[in-house]
């Protein structure tokens, strides 16, 4: 059996803060798969970069140890040669989108292999069909949802057919059906002789994966969060009811939302669930006042009608982080900051040790926690909206997130998050289920999760490990 990947006591430290990867060794042969786990910020993404040769070729820092791809030492082999052997899908797929259309994104990698136009066309058509991207082939990648971008990044890499796939959180932005489909596709690749490395927090999706090895990276262990600090975040409770009537959004000639009507209550944590591309992000942007729409949107509070004043945490935190340190990011343009509130946010979100670190150097999960802290530091009047807040979070930090959202709701605020993590959604007070034609159902998770017909209508699978939670 041929060894495709091996690493011998590989370490790496970034120059800005010295964080990175502790000594790690591994070996992967043809037909095998490797799961890499560990808490947020332990170095999974750094290891993925080391295994593909992006470290040391593209990232500065101190590396020791050696990595071999198909017998070639990565620090002595040009990156363009290594890219023929291994493909990497980033944790943030938007960071690897280069082309003006979905189809051209796939074509770009194939042209760099020097394939004939006939072979390129065959692979493009096959890949678009396999990843259910045919209807999006002429769309700009930048207009896709996060899940659709993740599918496109996977499609573009697999179309090149490298012997080794290295995937950084490949399931994080996918709906449950798409996640199971991807696991099946990766499983077939290993049975056909390929190899796969999967860095993930959602290991439960891989429980039946054939020939799967597992390593768990050590990292800087999280400090015990000071949950009593949640009290600082609460405000005087008022009755808040957000009413939406006949909301519609059109963008680029496409109807995204069509005559949607619903309400949201303060005092509840509401989870929005639906397939990739159904309109979850667009809906949150409308509620935050960032997306033009037609229809009526108002908040009933303090016995009067008000315009919604809601903070929002984007699915891609890079879009709202730009300061040189976490401290400066959270306190940005606040004239007289409430330092007690600031310190509580650091404790609750486990960010104290990163206070002087540039936010964009953090892991994806850590960046999301910083983005949430920046929003909550500004005390949004009516509540907070979070787009896929659990991406990149381990179980401990998901617990902290839920504890915080529950405290905000207990203060009477509107708290809404979108998610593909059904296990997380099951712990909300209310589910809002979205389909292509609008809102399919709304109610307590314990009721909706037991109604198979609704989920079949949505085209979503309920993972078997979620049912016991109900």
Cite the ranges covered by each PLM segment.
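Conserved ABC ATPase "signature" region
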Residues: 118-136, 339-354, 373-376
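ABC-family nucleotide-binding domains
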Residues: 175, 387, 394
